[in-house]
Amino acid sequence: MKFEAVVRTELGKGASRRLRHAGKFPAVIYGGEAAAVAIELVHADVINQMDKPEFYETITLVIDGAEVKVKPQDVQRHAFKPKVEHMDFIRI
């Protein structure tokens, strides 16, 4: 499973809200030797794949042309809407 991701330049509550209104959501990749990276993902691409068991195994994120293998660590969902608010990924 492969998703396109973009490194976030704006961080914080307001920037995250703007992402969500634009049909995207914030995420972070951490673990391993490299530093943590804040990214943004397209909500429709991810939410359609979340009900598949393969989603919770290994995922490949393409960030600026580089492929990073990750595993979902935590998912924060909206309280009553079927939306993802934020995700944490751990490097493999």
Swiss-Prot record:
GO cellular component terms attached to this protein's record: cytosolic large ribosomal subunit
Listed InterPro entries: Rbsml_bL25/Gln-tRNA_synth_N, Ribosomal_bL25/Gln-tRNA_synth, Ribosomal_bL25_short, Ribosomal_L25_dom, Ribosomal_uL5_bac-type
Cross-referenced Gene3D superfamilies: Ribosomal Protein L25, Chain P
GO biological process, one term: translation
Alphabetical UniProt keywords: Ribonucleoprotein, Ribosomal protein, RNA-binding, rRNA-binding
Transport as UniProt keyword: no
Any one GO MF annotation of this record: 5S rRNA binding
CDD domains: Ribosomal_L25_TL5_CTC (cd00495)
Family (UniProt): Belongs to the bacterial ribosomal protein bL25 family.
Subunit annotation: Part of the 50S ribosomal subunit; part of the 5S rRNA/L5/L18/L25 subcomplex. Contacts the 5S rRNA. Binds to the 5S rRNA independently of L5 and L18.
Function: This is one of the proteins that binds to the 5S RNA in the ribosome where it forms part of the central protuberance.
Name assigned to this protein: Large ribosomal subunit protein bL25
Lineage: Bacteria, Pseudomonadati, Pseudomonadota, Gammaproteobacteria, Vibrionales
